[in-house]
């Protein structure tokens, strides 16, 4: 195998790893943000888990975060503004990424 092939394989492996980590970070962020929103909605017990799953699956509608933001804005009408939701999502993502780095 040539140096070029080895380099190509290394870049492909890094890309796959980065994509996997981004997916895991988004999933963890969505879980945490779903639990936060469930609390604002007054949900308890199994309803928290069910609502959190709704938030997680909402992220599969399209690429990016807009599908999750739309769901939360609609569900949290009067309880949190779009700006508050986006700020919370960004803060939680930073926490999740920091935790993932520490986990290795």
Where are these regions (language model features)?
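A charge-rich, low-complexity, intrinsically flexible signal that marks solvent-exposed coils, linkers
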Residues: 1-104
């Amino acid at each position: 195998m040539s140096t070029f092939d080895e380099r190509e394989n290394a870049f492909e492996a890094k890309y796959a790893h980065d994509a996997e980590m981004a997916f895991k970070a988004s999933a963890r962020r969505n879980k945490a943000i779903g639990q936060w929103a469930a609390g604002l909605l007054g949900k308890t017990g199994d309803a928290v888990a069910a609502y959190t799953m709704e938030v997680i699956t909402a992220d599969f509608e399209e690429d990016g975060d807009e599908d999750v933001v739309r769901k939360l804005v609609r569900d949290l009408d009067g309880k949190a503004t779009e700006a508050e939701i986006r700020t919370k999502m960004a803060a939680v993502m930073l926490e999740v990424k920091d935790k993932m780095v520490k986990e290795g």
